[in-house]
């Protein structure tokens, strides 16, 4: 029998110290990685529940194990809430991650060796959109499209040309580092022209879509996937959505289980259900508007200080800072800002002369920043502090002094806007 007083701190103090250190880091550092967010105590409560003990292979009402009557309720709630949130007819809440959701879509709609057309990782796509280092680039004949380097905007004429030339089985729309608005209808038009499936990965903008602040791809795509963290702010996991299509729905269900996964993580599915309920609340839309406002405010500060923003601005939660003109690598910028307790990630920019391990840019996102209550004015000031660090990066002595000064400002901002009050 387990005693409910059992805890990690007493049993494994070494591990507990790493956990408490990370909790403190999250409170003391400003998080600007576009794919990261803070999840609610309610979501964490579900994830830490006894639902983790239950195996539930199959789907609600059709399981391969007994004793699933209560986890069926949790999964059914998650399914219905996801469908309602995004106006979908079908939802599969079982994928353990966005990448596994994407893998299931490939398995459902393509055969190994089929041609796919997706956004190049170097231009803002994702590993699973056909990168040669991913299963999507190894199992399938991946053709890649990108942005117009001069404008930073998707080149729809080039996408259409590639589609006509290569006749892909599936076209993938979506991104991990693109600050514009995607024209889902145009992608649908191109897919229809060549008889391809249209698969949209909206992992980065799902929260904005749920709040009505970014175009919803569900009415246009054959299949849509997303992660459930990032802008949605839920637990780490994946989600598949679709319009009513019995044949595709059956293929998707079979591709997730037994195709890609065995037993679903019922504690995480319960956490997804909680998160979807939170996303339907009016305050979630207010939060997403703050995400947008903060990103736009930061862009203005960077532009005012002479830094180039890929595409010239942002229409979502993220933007790319191009550091080529300053001869600063993304790697050294990432490290310097990290020393000032500002967490970002290095990122390639269009026509980047440096390797993906070094890069010439930074990807900056505001979901976590807005989550802790930071407003647009504070975000604009934060961006100026970041510019101070970047401006000093070539002068070791000046950089050390600047980092010390910025850390003091960051500490005050974090204290004024705690993650978990």
From Swiss-Prot:
(6S)-5,6,7,8-tetrahydrofolate binds at residues 121, 125-127, 355-357. Keywords: Amino-acid biosynthesis, Cytoplasm, One-carbon metabolism, Pyridoxal phosphate, Transferase. Disulfide bonds: none annotated. Pathway: One-carbon metabolism; tetrahydrofolate interconversion; Amino-acid biosynthesis; glycine biosynthesis; glycine from L-serine: step 1/1. It catalyses: (6R)-5,10-methylene-5,6,7,8-tetrahydrofolate + glycine + H2O = (6S)-5,6,7,8-tetrahydrofolate + L-serine. One of its GO terms (molecular function) is pyridoxal phosphate binding. PANTHER family: SERINE HYDROXYMETHYLTRANSFERASE. This is Serine hydroxymethyltransferase. It comes from Psychromonas ingrahamii (strain DSM 17664 / CCUG 51855 / 37). The gene is glyA.
């Amino acid at each position: 029998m387990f005693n409910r007083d059992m805890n990690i701190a007493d049993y494994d103090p070494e591990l507990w110290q790493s956990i408490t250190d990370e909790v403190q880091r999250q409170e003391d550092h400003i998080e600007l990685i576009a794919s990261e967010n803070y999840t609610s105590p309610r979501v964490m409560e579900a994830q830490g529940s006894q639902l983790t003990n239950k195996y539930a292979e199959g789907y609600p009402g059709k399981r391969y194990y007994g004793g699933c009557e209560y986890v069926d309720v949790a999964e059914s709630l998650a399914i219905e809430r996801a469908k309602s949130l995004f106006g979908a007819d079908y939802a599969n809440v079982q994928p353990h991650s966005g990448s596994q959701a994407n893998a299931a879509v490939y398995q459902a709609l393509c055969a190994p060796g089929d041609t796919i057309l997706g956004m190049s990782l170097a231009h803002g796509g994702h590993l699973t959109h056909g990168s040669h280092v991913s299963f999507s680039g190894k199992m399938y004949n991946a053709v890649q499209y990108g942005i117009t380097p001069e404008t930073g905007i998707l080149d729809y004429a080039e996408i259409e040309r590639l589609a006509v030339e290569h006749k892909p089985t599936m076209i993938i729309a979506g991104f991990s580092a693109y600050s514009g608005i995607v024209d889902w209808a145009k992608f649908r038009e191109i897919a229809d022209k060549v008889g391809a499936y249209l698969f949209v990965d909206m992992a980065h903008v799902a929260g904005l879509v749920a709040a009505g602040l970014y175009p919803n791809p569900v009415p246009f795509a054959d299949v849509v996937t997303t992660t459930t963290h990032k802008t949605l702010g839920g637990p780490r996991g994946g989600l598949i959505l679709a319009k009513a299509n019995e044949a595709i729905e059956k293929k998707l269900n079979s591709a997730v289980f037994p195709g890609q996964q065995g037993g679903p993580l019922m504690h995480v599915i319960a956490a997804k259900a909680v998160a979807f309920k939170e996303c339907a609340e009016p305050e979630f839309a207010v939060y997403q508007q703050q995400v947008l406002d903060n990103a736009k405010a930061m862009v203005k500060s960077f532009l005012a200080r002479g830094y180039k923003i890929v595409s010239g601005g942002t229409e979502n939660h993220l933007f790319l800072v191009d550091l080529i003109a300053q001869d600063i690598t993304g790697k050294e910028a990432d490290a310097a800002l990290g020393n000032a307790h500002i967490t970002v990630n290095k990122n390639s920019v269009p026509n980047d002369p440096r390797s993906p391990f070094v890069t010439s840019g930074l990807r900056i996102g505001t979901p976590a920043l807005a989550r802790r209550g930071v407003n647009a004015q504070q975000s604009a000031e934060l961006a100026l502090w970041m510019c101070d660090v970047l401006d000093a990066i070539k002068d070791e002595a000046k950089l050390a002094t600047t980092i010390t000064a910025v850390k003091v400002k960051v500490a005050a901002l974090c204290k004024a806007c705690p993650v978990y009050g």
